[in-house]
Amino acid sequence: MPDVRRCDFCGRIIEPGTGKMFVKNDGTILWFCSSKCERNMLKLGRDPKKVRWTEKHREFMAEQRGEL
């Protein structure tokens, strides 16, 4: 059974056989579900907690409100 992976930017589940794996020079592996996520993290350098449409932002805001 293939591993279920999550996008390192938005937190969505990546279906097996889809998505993109990016390996940094230090050996860190990043998984992206779409080019939108890849661009936002690598090219634009955005923090997932500050981008409103990501799961990581929703989790961060819930934590700030004390819902978790």
Swiss-Prot record:
Gene3D superfamilies to which the protein is assigned, alphabetical: Ribosomal protein L24e
Disulfide bond listed as a keyword: no
Residues annotated to bind Zn(2+): C7, C10, C33, C37
Cofactor: binding comment: Binds 1 zinc ion per subunit.
Gene Ontology CC entries for this record: ribonucleoprotein complex; ribosome
Pfam family, one: Ribosomal_L24e
Claim: Calcium is one of the keywords in the record: no
GO molecular-function terms, A-Z: rRNA binding; structural constituent of ribosome; zinc ion binding
Purpose: Binds to the 23S rRNA.
Similarity remark: Belongs to the eukaryotic ribosomal protein eL24 family.
Name of the protein: Large ribosomal subunit protein eL24
Organism of provenance: Methanopyrus kandleri (strain AV19 / DSM 6324 / JCM 9639 / NBRC 100938)
Organism lineage string: Archaea, Methanobacteriati, Methanobacteriota, Methanomada group, Methanopyri
Gene name linked to the record: rpl24e
